[in-house]
Amino acid sequence: GEIINDVVTFWGIELINTQLYSYVLACSFLIVIILSPMLSGIADVSGRKLQLMKIFCLAGSLGCLGLYAFDPSHMEWSMSALFLANIGFWGSLGFYNAFLPQIAPANEHDKLSATGFAMGYIGSVLLLLLCLALIMLVGSFMTPWTFVLVGIWWFSWAQPAFRKLPSTPTKLPTQGRLIAQGFKELRKVARDLSGRKELVRFLWGFFI
């Protein structure tokens, strides 16, 4: 296949490809870190946890589909798709984990969580093997189609959870109350972090 140079151009700026990749991931993680506490507070008030998880899942799937059009000469689009896919994955995972107390008693949390992760890893390995087989046996031109497969696989296997997980939407509070609840959760996280210097140093090191 085509060999991509180590240096790529992104919005007119030349960067090492791995450097750009790290920057995009770090920015997407930062967005998730800021949004998650706010959205979890909004979800608690509105009862729309499942709806928010669907939005993130759809965004992540669309990001994967967008990587089909990955083009080294147009890194802006390619990195935008990666950015969206990463936000979709980590954003939906937060709501996914929040459902555990609603679907199982406390003494079954560990078992159910381990089972869920095991099934997820099995599914991802099966898809990985399929994608590798397409690339190695059919040809490298199938590489873009593997991103399409990932997007479809992700969204398709999310449907059983979307149908079965409890959803208890309530009448939406005023916009002001929703925003206030979101910032309240964000302040709570900030206060919690202020007492954990090691974690703060780790986060600074991660993003820098």
Language model feature labels by segment:
Residues 33, 54-73:
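C-terminal ends and interior cores of transmembrane alpha-helices
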Residues 166-204:
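Juxtamembrane intracellular "pre-TM" segments in multi-pass secondary transporters
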Residues 111-134:
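Glycine-rich segments within core transmembrane alpha-helices of 12-TM secondary carriers
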Residues 43-57:
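Cytoplasmic membrane-interface "Motif A"-like loop-to-helix N-cap segments
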Residues 57, 63, 74-92:
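Hydrophobic core of transmembrane alpha-helices in multi-pass small-molecule transporters
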Residues 127-136, 152-170:
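C-terminal membrane-cytosol helix-exit motif in multi-pass small-molecule transporters
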Residues 18-41:
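Central cavity-lining transmembrane alpha-helices of secondary-active solute carriers
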Residues 1-6, 83, 197-208:
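Pair of pore-lining "gating" transmembrane helices in MFS-fold secondary transporters
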